[in-house]
Curated annotation (Swiss-Prot):
The modification 3-methylthioaspartic acid is found at D81. Part of the 30S ribosomal subunit. Contacts proteins S8 and S17. May interact with IF1 in the 30S initiation complex. This is Small ribosomal subunit protein uS12. It comes from Mycobacterium gordonae. It comes from the Bacteria.
């Protein structure tokens, strides 16, 4: 009759809507602390993308000049020790 359904792979970067990168505007720039064995102040930003989705994005590198209303280009890629941060 009907065979078993194939599992549909879950999209890890849904907010990018299939694009490699997406532009956005920083709504909040702040620091958070990582999960248990690690200790630091990781720089992250809340970004409203052109796809009208608001995501939390990591700010890589040492030092940055981002503030509220800064235009940023967001790509996929999670930060393992920050829960909920799936963009850079």
């Amino acid at each position: 009759r009907k065979g078993r359904r194939d599992k549909v792979a879950k999209v890890k970067t849904a907010a990018l809507k299939g694009s490699p990168q997406r532009r956005g505007v920083c709504t909040r720039v702040y620091t958070t602390t990582p999960k248990k064995p690690n200790s630091a102040l990781r720089k992250v930003a809340r970004v409203k993308l052109t796809s009208q989705v608001e995501v939390t994005a990591y700010i890589p590198g040492e030092g940055h000049n981002l503030q509220e209303h800064s235009m940023v280009l967001v790509r996929g890629g999670r930060v393992k020790d920050l829960p909920g941060v799936r963009y850079k």
